[in-house]
Amino acid sequence: GLPAGTGELQSETGRIYRFIEQDAPDWSDRQTDFSPTQIKNYPVQGLATGDIVPMMLGVLFDNFYGDPDVLLINTVHDSILFDVSDDVNHKEVARKIKTIMEQAPDYFNSRFNPKIKFDLPLKAEVQWGKSWGQMTETL
């Protein structure tokens, strides 16, 4: 096979991405199983799900900590899931979550500026329903 290569990329926020180019068998026409374009997406996707979402989870946690009616329960990629009691105004909770999430650029800049300037607006979408399959309303 072909010799393996390794490399790494450090994002502006300090996150280190390591990648490995595996040996390819001789019969594979001297191709490797790693495409250099794969690493190009790491900083973009990593900024969203590796930096911004965890930062904002902390802000959301601080805002809802101790509230038994609003429980932060999970994340899936860039989605954040809450379990909200039927006893509270869901629209009010949704607006609060949306407002907090749309402040992500300000929060990000307060932590990383002047090293990194995040000057793009982020729009957050909030949906709710009894289950994922029943989510219909959007803010």
List the model feature ranges, each with a label.
Residues 1-139:
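Conserved catalytic core of nucleotide polymerization and phosphodiester-bond processing enzymes
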